[in-house]
Amino acid sequence: TYGYAVLVSDETESYYYTSHLEAKVSAKTHEIIKIQRSVIGSFAAMIEARDGITGLHIKNTSNFVKILTHAMQNSPKYADRITDDYAQMVSAAAKLHDIGKIAVPDYVLQKPGKLTDEEYEIMKKHPAEGARIIKETLGKLENDEYVHIAYNMAYYHHEKFAGGGYPCNLKGTEIPLSARIMAIC
């Protein structure tokens, strides 16, 4: 009978140890997510510091994305694709869609009037630059799905459903859903 007592004791210790480790991993995961969101907020603040209009645009679009994804969740067409987690990631990633504007020179970004053709070509590079920044800075920090969503939103948010957008001239469902949502907002 002593053998059973030792076995039960070992199993109980193992269970509590495993539970303790799982709790620690969960706490660290939440801490990492908190840090990542702080980094994202810092990126958004950097954009806002360079261009006050873009900063206000970032806050508004993030709120609009949240409203739109919530409405889409109630639509039979998108209910299975837009989970609560997806909606939350798209809303958070919306803050980064214009991060590539950090690489746009001030004379273009802050120009009060219409851009020349040359300046417009410079401005059109911000989606690709934003996607690159997201991949390089968040690729090792954030979960793969979030990085994929943020990358797509930054890279494709100027594509048009009917075609004629940039940088890839995609159309319709060739454009990732997250980028289509961003383009509306």
Where are these regions (language model features)?
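Sensory coupling linkers of modular signal transduction proteins
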Residues: 2-32
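Histidine- and acidic-residue-rich, metal-dependent catalytic cores
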Residues: 34-185
